[in-house]
């Protein structure tokens, strides 16, 4: 879904409901599905994150895709998912609207002889929620494929910590 409304008439009230975990919102994100027998090792090789253990539905990471000079090309939220129409385990990369096609082309151009395919999934939409609204979202949205959970401030495999403070305000965020 490339378009998400900015608000529904009362942005301050809507923000308060979101912050309280009483509402959810459609997010303006493109979804790129990466599938095939080699996707785990392939994405670990071409990204900044270790994804070889991302085998179970719902496991998630934040990942960057860099150019040859180390500049960020794409930032994505990666979540393992069993996509209903294909029936196979894959990873969904959630990127900013308008970036999906470019990321899919980049991933397909770097696959060489590996059994992996990246494709934009315009039929999949992204919604965001905090706290109790995650359960409400699951009850409202038909054909919910998976949820992405922000692992921060925890340490993911292959990651490191840079935060020693109190609980992060986005700890209950799901997309």
Where are these regions (language model features)?
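Basic, glycine/lysine-rich polyanion-binding surfaces/domains
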Residues: 1-175
